[in-house]
């Protein structure tokens, strides 16, 4: 849309579904200063009013005597259109919806620095029209002076004898056909070609040899291009970088992202780098999901996740699990429900960092119209917000009807098998778990037999210890100690997996299958896998 040249070739593949009759339009709302020369077009470009979300027409005067309304925050609506004839048309849309031509001069003044594929990265390092180097030097007469000096070279005298003879034969042939003759070689120009394209920046290597910057590594070329653009005193420069991590080490990616955020001009960046996402703490993230939906992610709701686990936003499908227990529990189930390795399928189970944070993160995904999964406890808080998220996510969000994962599993274990929960993965009674139970009972004897004998309700005691409940603690110090009890049970990823293992081993799965299986099938469907009737387990 902001190409500095009118020379742009389209093909059928540039159109949606290769349907050229449908044409295409790319439109943007841009704030432009007077230095962009937007007001010097053949037809005056009237500004729109920016209302905080979109460009709207300015307030219409009440009568003919009123002054023309001046927008408090003027913006312009620019667009590029691909016609059914495979032609490109640059236009500016007026507030009354009239469309006028957008000149190449204005587009060149705006100045786009584009870093795409490696084959295009040297454009801004050469003296072609509209390049970063061209805008930096801003010497309009340079090409003419270079052309004049080149034209002074007598090309005819530098030809070999065979070449001179071939040229004479051609001249004679043209003369016989009454065509222009008396041929000689000289400097000519052609549409799309410029003598400036042969001129570029050179830099000394370690050996002191001047080498074209275009021949250096991809990362070095990109960094050099951005430095050239930054040296240009332009108020409207727009930087577009595809895969910012290309050719750069992680520390340089981090440095580049931080640098772009401090620039007064705007940058658009695509990335598959967790380092880049984590470093963009001042940027606005937009996410493209597996269904090709693109949506904005509110910074205030994703900031913690962006910093701690940026790979959340790079997965084919991310499942936001409330905490470590849920991560381990869900991972165990998905390992058995999904065909193939989870990571190979692009499936990532992420830590939502608590119930409120998980809700906020899922709300951000829903607001962006994006596809994510979720697995959370039901703490009885914000039921309306959870209901709204559930209505949008459907079966991809699993939330217990009541309580936590530990509560729901332990509640269904047979009375005669409750002591099996006290055992560790080796099948032995875990002394630390016994200690948590004895502490809550206020007894010194940590034997399982004594604990069972003294506990008025063993199930409730295990649930309290496994969840780190502080209820009933005699003092504040005891509250702190009791709160940590959950770590001795299932408050970890390994503990979540252990809990899932015991769910199957102790016969709890059949009772929970109607609740959990729809969630697992929703994840399978998101990955393009067919529905299953049960989960394989030992």
For each predicted feature, which ranges?
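Hydrophobic positions in the central parallel beta-sheet of the AAA+
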Residues: 113, 239-241, 319
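Electropositive, glycine-dotted interaction segments
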Residues: 39-148
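Extended helical coiled-coil dimerization/tether regions that scaffold
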Residues: 90, 124-127, 131-224, 228-238, ...
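Conserved P-loop NTP-binding catalytic core
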Residues: 1-70
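Short hydrophobic beta-strand that contains or immediately precedes a catalytic carboxylate
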Residues: 215, 318-322
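Switch/communication elements of ASCE P-loop NTPase nucleotide-binding domains
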Residues: 1-4, 194-195, 201-312, 328, ...
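Acidic, Mg2+-coordinating catalytic modules of nucleic-acid enzymes
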Residues: 313-318, 327-538
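Conserved catalytic network of the ASCE P-loop NTPase/AAA+ motor domain
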Residues: 17-22, 69-71, 105-108, 230-234, ...
């Amino acid at each position: 849309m902001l190409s500095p040249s009118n020379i742009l070739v389209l093909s059928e593949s540039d159109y949606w579904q290769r349907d050229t009759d449908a044409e295409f339009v790319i439109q943007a709302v841009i704030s432009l200063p007077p230095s962009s020369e937007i007001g010097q077009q053949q037809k005056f470009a009237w500004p729109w009013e920016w209302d905080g979300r979109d460009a709207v027409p300015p307030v219409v005067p009440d009568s003919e005597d009123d002054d023309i309304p001046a927008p408090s925050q003027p913006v312009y609506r620019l667009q590029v259109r691909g016609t059914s004839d495979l032609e490109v048309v640059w236009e500016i849309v007026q507030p009354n919806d009239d469309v006028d031509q957008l000149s190449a001069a204005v587009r060149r003044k705006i100045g786009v620095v584009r870093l795409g594929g490696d084959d295009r990265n040297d454009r801004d390092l050469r003296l072609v029209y509209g390049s970063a180097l061209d805008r930096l030097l801003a010497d309009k007469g340079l090409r003419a002076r270079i052309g004049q000096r080149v034209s002074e070279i007598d090309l005819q005298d530098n030809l070999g004898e065979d070449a001179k003879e071939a040229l004479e034969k051609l001249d004679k042939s043209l003369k016989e056909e009454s065509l222009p003759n008396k041929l000689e070689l000289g400097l000519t120009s052609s549409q799309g070609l410029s003598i400036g394209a042969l001129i570029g920046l050179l830099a000394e290597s370690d050996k002191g040899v001047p080498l074209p910057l275009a021949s250096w590594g991809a990362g070095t070329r990109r960094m050099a291009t951005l430095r050239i653009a930054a040296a240009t005193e332009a108020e409207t420069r727009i930087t577009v970088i595809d895969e910012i991590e290309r050719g750069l080490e992680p520390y340089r990616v981090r440095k580049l992202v931080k640098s772009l955020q401090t620039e007064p001009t705007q940058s658009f960046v695509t990335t598959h780098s967790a380092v880049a996402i984590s470093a963009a703490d001042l940027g606005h993230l937009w996410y493209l999901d597996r269904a090709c939906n693109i949506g904005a992610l509110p910074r205030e709701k994703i900031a913690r996740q962006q910093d701690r686990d940026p790979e959340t936003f790079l997965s084919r499908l991310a499942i936001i699990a409330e905490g470590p227990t849920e991560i381990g529990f869900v991972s165990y189930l998905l390992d058995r429900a999904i065909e193939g390795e989870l990571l190979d399928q692009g499936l990532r189970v992420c830590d939502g960092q608590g119930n409120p944070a998980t809700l906020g993160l899922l709300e951000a995904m829903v607001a962006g119209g994006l596809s994510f999964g979720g697995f959370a406890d039901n703490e009885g808080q914000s039921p309306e917000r959870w209901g709204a998220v559930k209505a949008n996510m459907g079966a991809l969000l699993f939330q217990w009807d009541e309580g936590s994962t530990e509560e729901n599993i332990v509640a269904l274990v047979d009375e005669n098998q409750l002591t099996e929960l006290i055992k560790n993965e080796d099948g032995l009674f875990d002394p630390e778990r016994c200690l948590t139970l004895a502490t809550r009972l206020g007894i010194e004897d940590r034997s399982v037999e004594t604990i069972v004998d003294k506990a008025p309700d063993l199930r409730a005691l295990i649930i309290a210890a496994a969840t780190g409940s502080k209820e009933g603690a005699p003092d504040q110090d005891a509250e702190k100690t009791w709160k940590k009890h959950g770590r001795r049970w299932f408050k970890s990823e390994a503990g979540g997996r252990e809990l899932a293992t015991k769910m199957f081993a102790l016969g709890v799965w059949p009772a929970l299958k109607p609740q959990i299986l729809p969630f697992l099938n929703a994840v399978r469907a998101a990955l393009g896998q067919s529905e299953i009737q049960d989960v394989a387990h030992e």
